[in-house]
Amino acid sequence: MATTSVSSPKSKPSWVSFLSGGLAGVTAKSAVAPLERVKILYQIKSELYSLNSVYGSMLKIVENEGIKGLWRGNSATILRVFPYAAVQFLSYETIKNHLVADKSSSFQIFLAGSAAGGIAVCATYPLDLLRARLAIEIHKKPTKPHHLLKSTFTKDGVKGIYRGIQPTLIGILPYGGISFSTFEFLKRIAPLNEIDENGQISGTYKLIAGGIAGGVAQTVAYPFDVVRRRVQTHGFGDAKAVVNLEHGTLRTIAHILKEEGILALYKGLSINYVKVIPTASIAFYTYEYLSNFFNKL
């Protein structure tokens, strides 16, 4: 295994990290948008989930809404993901380059990734709320994103457009930290046959490393994602699962465990693996490819 043969990249200009991150996020999320919509629909309902029903759910969406229905809410996703991923990767690179003393320390990289995820969530959360609510409208004409955001703000104010941010932040801290630190660790131990004469790791290895990083991080953070979606969509559209908005994140998790069992906290996880692994692979690979490309301009 190689631990010192990988070339150490120079610090990227801020605009490179920002633009590369945004484009990487949009590319990855758009590719798996149909799976994301089906996952959200399962998370917010109390019925049992089966991976075998994914295909049937997609067919039902196509039957009711047409093929475009599989991408309903993706416009809001793109509006959110570009700034989210841009801010996340920019924050990560900035923190790593200026505050992380030991670039080979997985713990310090974990902290940088966690902080970057938290910053990105706070900056773009209303758009994430918007995406979730658009995704669960399955029996009526789609609401215009800006109309939905305006009506939510008018009805509930700032608190309304940030509903569910607590479990989101609690979940993104381990997710961001684990995904970045795992990806960087896997790059450091890349086999010699995956490294070229210039010290560059192969694209195939980066795709695999990104997928592993996303899968590991998602397993740890997923229960918070379920809570987030339930809080975000409570009383809206086809959301049926019971949730008490007065409860904090941990009390909500305890309530779900009591009423529905531990499997409810992992509802949709199997489809999420199918979604997250290619998403993380594409995002990390595209980011590194584009940042290297832009650095040469």
Swiss-Prot record:
InterPro entries per UniProt: GDC-like, Mit_carrier, Mitochondrial_sb/sol_carrier, Mt_carrier_dom_sf
Q: Does the keyword Cell membrane apply?
A: no
Q: Tell me, what's a Pfam family for it?
A: Mito_carr
- What this protein is called in its record is Mitochondrial substrate carrier family protein P
Q: What does this protein do?
A: Mitochondrial solute carriers shuttle metabolites, nucleotides, and cofactors through the mitochondrial inner membrane. Required for the accumulation of coenzyme A in the mitochondrial matrix.
Residues spanning the membrane: 15-35, 66-86, 107-127, 165-185, 207-227, 262-282
Q: In the UniProt record, what gene is named as encoding this protein?
A: mcfP
In its UniProt record, which GO terms are filed under biological process?
A: coenzyme A transport; mitochondrial coenzyme A transmembrane transport
